[in-house]
Amino acid sequence: MYINDEDLAKLVAVQVAEMDKKNKVCDAKNDYSRRLDKITNGLNDAEGIKLNFKVYLTKEYNAFACPDGSVRVYSALMDILSDDELLGVIGHEIGHVALRHSKKAWRSALLRSAVSDAIASQSRTWACLSDSQLGDITSLALSAKHSRYHETQADEFGYIFLKRCNKNPWAMGLALTKLKKMLNQKDISKYAKLLEAFSSHPNFDERIEHIKQLAERDNYKAK
């Protein structure tokens, strides 16, 4: 079953809107929103996909980007990362969108779900799906683990992303170092979503070393 980009974007947009309703979204005057606006100022699109940013006020640590261009950052993550480190993480997530990894994850989630036959039998429209079915697809897509190659690509995208924003790209390595430290916490439950997304192979040490090599190659200070 083939799902075109337009239909997929519509599905994702609807599901992101549902997630926005279920989470506490910071309003425009909130300090977190103002900080994110400042950090992402001028970031309008990724490979032609229009971006939109919001902050979820929560004690959980996470950030994700979806194929429709929606980028969501959790306030707790903002508390532990510097502006440049956060921009690197955002760049990594946008990389998955720009490089079409996210689209593959959503398509895979649909095909893995029990509703693919139902969609195919109704001219591949989303109208036949229940809220719970759509929710299952969303959960599968957002929890999908990317391949080693895709994670490396996204890390490199985040690195280049920082360079294009005139930032020291080693901030990507510093962000990964902080995420690695989370694994050593006694209670990692509040980090679960973020670590699930970021701790897939290659491991943190390999990823940090790769970014360090890129930074040293480009004459940026890596410390």
PLM features: residue spans?
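A Zn2+-metalloprotease active-site environment signal
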Residues: 1-223
